[in-house]
Each structure stands twice: as structure tokens, then as C-alpha cells.
From Swiss-Prot:
<dbReference type="InterPro" id="IPR023677">
    <property type="entry name" value="UbiD_bacteria"/>
</dbReference>
<feature type="binding site">
    <location>
        <begin position="192"/>
        <end position="194"/>
    </location>
    <ligand>
        <name>prenylated FMN</name>
    </ligand>
</feature>
<keyword id="KW-0831">Ubiquinone biosynthesis</keyword>
<feature type="binding site">
    <location>
        <begin position="197"/>
        <end position="198"/>
    </location>
    <ligand>
        <name>prenylated FMN</name>
    </ligand>
</feature>
<dbReference type="GO" id="GO:0046872">
    <property type="term" value="F:metal ion binding"/>
</dbReference>
<keyword id="KW-0285">Flavoprotein</keyword>
<keyword id="KW-0479">Metal-binding</keyword>
<feature type="binding site">
    <location>
        <position position="241"/>
    </location>
    <ligand>
        <name>Mn(2+)</name>
    </ligand>
</feature>
<comment type="function">
    <text>Catalyzes the decarboxylation of 3-octaprenyl-4-hydroxy benzoate to 2-octaprenylphenol, an intermediate step in ubiquinone biosynthesis.</text>
</comment>
<dbReference type="GO" id="GO:0006744">
    <property type="term" value="P:ubiquinone biosynthetic process"/>
</dbReference>
<comment type="subunit">
    <text>Homohexamer.</text>
</comment>
<dbReference type="InterPro" id="IPR049381">
    <property type="entry name" value="UbiD-like_C"/>
</dbReference>
<dbReference type="Pfam" id="PF20695">
    <property type="entry name" value="UbiD_N"/>
</dbReference>
<dbReference type="Pfam" id="PF20696">
    <property type="entry name" value="UbiD_C"/>
</dbReference>
<dbReference type="GO" id="GO:0005886">
    <property type="term" value="C:plasma membrane"/>
</dbReference>
<dbReference type="Pfam" id="PF01977">
    <property type="entry name" value="UbiD"/>
</dbReference>
<comment type="similarity">
    <text>Belongs to the UbiD family.</text>
</comment>
């Protein structure tokens, strides 16, 4: 089976198993804390995806660590290795700002990209595997799902990999987003979406256009990897996540209309939750251990009432945990970093590399290397990072270095900061900017400051002093010593 041609999650799991990337766990393990402990140890060791076939107290298997290595993220995106994700980024950059062909030859050069675009439309099915089993009304019971409790002080079991499908009242296109959902009853979940996210924006538009009416929502669990990854990738606003998933997979995304609303969900998903949000129905969410390594504070979010649960025969429950990096979101961040680079370079060609260290919670700190061309150039780039893609709206720190620095080597970055920066001159502070609601270090929830560090060599106009020249070895001497190095036998 080709990684480019998997059809659904089960095909992908077969592919992983063939390559030694999936381990089946037959020993009974408790979704309350125990699965997290095993998954965490496995991820930190770079281990396989885990399919817990006998979770204690449940008949449904639990899939964890699906994207626990960058390699598996790349495979989910239809690529053989992480480096190939740069090509995905180039395609997204092209789709974000397509350029018309400059001539006949250029048209032929662009044909592969245009051919990929032809795979974009979805394929609508009348019936689908995700609707093989149906529960509605009093038969709806979310407690039958093996929803994990990840950390000792978590408020309740938490759905983590739910792909939430919404549509605003004035939009033709649906929005797909991944928002955690706290289990509070047999048919009740808390939908934790932040105000700037697509689902929350759709809901706010609905409230304004149709006050008092229930807002339709559906959640897909266990969708195919391309569709899941499409929801966490910087897809252009003009492109749907389903269409992007089709590009990754090489085939059109198959969808089916829900039973209780007009939303379209992935036809091959393992489980679908259908329901609504009643305007004004809110509940306190949390606390939960999160990707920061801390428990977040309790806050109020809308309640999602589930009216239907549809699923495949022998459905698989897809889950994960979040905690201090490395965790699965951090691994996703490392892989998606390669997608971001070409998108940024399309807008800012002077950028050489861009790196989001996973230990910085994958998005709170960015290191940029660039070919500096004029005084003040580094500040333009840091402002561009904050404003160009909404994925970096919450990036608190941006460090800009010259292209002789390796953005992914802290030794290099720290050297540049300590030798090329004056703290007063080269630090930019911006107050009252959007900040992650989970960032308890900010003085106000959702609002805080940002810091830019210009660790580039300074040009005339930025300094009046003679600037230092880096030490460079004599290449002829290096070559002579290379030739006699083994003969010296220093380490033998």
C-alpha cells in the first residue's frame, strides 16, 4: 500500500503496521491515567503508534500516538519523509498567492500544481461507513466511549482529537477545527474554542444572524490522517480543509451529510457526534493539564448537546494527551514547521530558515534567519512573522539572526544574541497584543505583550562603532590538518 493512496484511518494503520510503526496492546489498560503514562513514555522514546485493544471497562479500542513522530506526520500528509513537507508548503504558498504563467514553458512547469488542484472538490456519498451504526435520543451515551482522563487533577474525561465541523450563516464553506471537549453528561460536552478560531467565529455570526436558534455542530472522531492534518495546517482562506486533504491524499475527500443537520462529515470517520449548541448554555471548563506543562484555569464555554452518535462497525476511538513538550502536538509542530517555511519565504524571500522550538510550546517562540539587506530589516521581518499568518498570533518571542546562524542550534542562536545584541537598542516590546488564553503569565487573559530580539549584525545607521569580524579558519591549513588527522592518532 502506497502512503499516497491510503483511503481511511484503517488503511493508514495497516500501512503503519507493515512498516513497524504500530504496536497493538492486548493487555487491559485503563483510559484513566494509564494510557497517558504508556503513550508518554513511548512518544519520548520515538516509539510507534499504539492501539489499545482492551481498554478497561470499554469494548472499543483506543488509538494513541498516531502522529507521535515527524515521520508519521509526513506519512499522513502523503510524503515519504519530513523534508518532503517543504513541497507541501510550496504548494500552499502557490495556492495562497497563485502567479499566472509567464509563458508557454512556464505553463507546462506549473501543470503539476494545476493538476493537483483538480483533486480539490469533495465527493458526496449517499451512505457512508461512519453511519453503519446509529444511536439517537435516549440511546445516546457518550460514557460508552473510552474517553481518556490524562492527568491526575483533570476535571473530567476529555475528547482531544475531535474534528469539529461548523458553518456560519453566510458561508458556503464549512470550517474544520480541533477543539478539546470536556465530558459532562451522557449527551453533553463543553466545546472549548477560543474566540478567534473558526468554529467560534461561525457561532458568533450565527448568534447575530439567527438569535435564539440552535447552532448545528458535528464532530468527527477517527477521520483519515489527511483530513485531520488539514485542520491543523495553514490552509489559505479560499481553500477548504477537505479540499486540502484531497490534495495530500491524491484523491477527493469523501463526505456524507449528517442525519440531523446539513453539515458534511468525513464519510470514513470512525465516529460522528451530531448535535447543537443552545445559545446561552455555558458551563465551566477545566482545569486540564495542557501543552504548556501546567493546568489551565477554569473558564466558561458553550455546551454541545449530542443528539446522534453514528459510527462504523468495530469503531476505533482516536485520542491523545497534551502535556509539557514533547507531546503529540509538539511533534506535529516540528513537522508542520517545514510547511511554514516556504509560505513565509513566498512573502519574505529574505528569510532563509524559520524554526519553532518544541520546548517553546511549538508556537510561543520563533527563530528566524535571514539575508539582511538594510538597517531595520530585522524588525520588518519580526513584524511580518507576527502579522502574516494567524498561526503566529500568539508567538510571544521572535529572534531574528543572520543567515550564518543555524536557527535550529541553540549554541548558534545564543552566541548571536550575546554578541550581536544591545538589550536597549535591539529589543522590541509590543504591548496589548493577542495572547493565548492558556498563557497565565500574561497580565490579562488573552491580552499581553510580545518581544522581538534583533540578533543580526548591525548596519550603518544602527550603530556608529566598528563592527566585529567573525573568526574564520584558514581553509588551506584546515585541509593540511585533515590530511594528517588520522596519523596524529589523538583519540586512539
Amino acid at each position: 500500500m502506497d502512503a499516497m493512496k491510503y483511503h481511511d484511518l484503517r488503511d493508514f494503520l495497516t500501512l503503519l503496521e507493515q512498516q513497524g510503526e504500530l504496536k497493538r496492546i492486548t493487555l487491559p489498560v485503563d483510559p484513566h491515567l494509564e494510557i497517558t503514562e504508556i503513550a508518554d513514555r513511548t512518544l519520548r522514546a520515538g516509539g510507534p503508534a499504539l492501539l489499545f485493544e482492551n481498554p478497561k471497562g470499554y469494548a472499543m479500542p483506543v488509538l494513541c500516538n498516531l502522529f507521535g513522530t515527524p515521520k508519521r506526520v509526513a506519512m499522513g500528509m502523503g510524503q515519504d519523509d519530513v523534508s518532503a513537507l517543504r513541497e507541501v508548503g510550496k504548494l500552499l504558498a502557490f495556492l495562497k498567492e497563485p502567479e499566472p504563467p509567464k509563458g508557454f514553458r512556464d505553463l507546462f512547469d506549473k501543470l503539476p500544481q494545476f493538476k493537483q488542484v483538480l483533486n480539490m472538490p469533495t465527493k458526496r456519498l449517499r451512505g457512508a461507513p461512519c453511519q453503519q451504526k446509529i444511536a439517537s435520543g435516549d440511546d445516546v451515551d457518550l460514557t460508552r466511549l473510552p474517553v481518556m482522563t490524562c492527568w491526575p487533577d483533570d476535571a473530567a474525561p476529555l475528547i482531544t482529537w475531535g474534528l469539529t465541523v461548523t458553518r456560519g450563516p453566510h458561508k458556503e464553506r464549512q470550517n474544520l477545527g480541533i477543539y478539546r471537549q470536556q465530558l459532562i453528561g451522557k449527551n453533553k460536552l463543553i466545546m472549548r474554542w477560543l474566540s478567534h478560531r473558526g468554529g467560534a467565529l461561525d457561532f458568533q455570526e450565527w448568534l447575530a444572524a439567527r438569535p435564539g436558534e440552535r447552532f448545528p455542530v458535528s464532530v468527527a472522531l477517527g477521520a483519515d490522517p489527511a483530513t485531520i492534518l488539514g485542520a491543523v495546517t495553514p490552509v489559505p482562506d479560499t481553500l477548504s480543509e477537505y479540499a486540502f486533504a484531497g490534495l495530500l491524499r491524491g484523491t477527493k475527500t469523501e463526505v456524507v451529510k449528517c442525519l440531523s443537520n446539513d453539515l458534511e462529515v468525513p464519510a470514513s470517520a470512525e465516529i460522528i457526534l451530531e448535535g447543537y449548541i443552545e445559545p446561552g448554555e455555558m458551563a465551566p471548563e477545566g482545569p486540564y493539564g495542557d501543552h504548556t506543562g501546567y493546568y489551565n484555569e477554569v473558564d466558561s464555554f458553550p455546551v454541545f448537546t449530542v443528539t446522534h452518535i453514528t459510527q462504523r462497525e468495530d469503531a476505533i476511538y482516536h485520542s491523545t494527551y497534551t502535556g509539557r513538550p514533547p507531546d503529540e502536538p509538539a511533534v506535529l509542530g516540528v513537522a508542520l514547521n517545514e510547511v511554514f517555511v516556504p509560505i513565509l519565504q513566498k512573502q519574505f524571500p529574505e528569510i532563509v530558515d524559520f524554526y519553532l522550538p518544541p520546548e517553546g510550546c511549538s508556537y510561543r517562540l520563533a527563530v528566524v534567519t535571514m539575508k539582511k539587506q538594510y538597517a531595520g530589516h530585522a524588525k520588518r521581518v519580526m513584524m511580518g512573522v507576527w502579522s502574516f499568518l494567524r498561526q503566529f498570533m500568539y508567538t510571544k518571542f521572535v529572534i531574528v539572526c543572520d543567515d550564518d546562524v543555524n536557527a535550529r542550534d541553540w549554541n548558534d542562536v545564543i552566541w548571536a544574541i550575546t554578541t550581536r545584541m544591545d538589550p536597549a537598542r535591539d529589543t522590541v516590546l509590543v504591548e496589548n497584543t493577542p495572547i493565548d488564553y492558556l498563557d497565565f503569565a500574561s497580565p490579562v487573559s488573552g491580552l499581553g505583550s510580545k518581544m522581538g530580539l534583533d540578533a543580526t549584525n548591525k548596519w550603518p545607521g544602527e550603530t556608529q562603532r566598528e563592527w566585529g569580524r567573525p573568526i574564520v579558519k584558514d581553509p588551506e591549513v584546515t585541509a593540511r590538518i585533515d590530511a594528517i588527522w588520522d596519523e596524529l592518532a589523538i583519540f586512539k
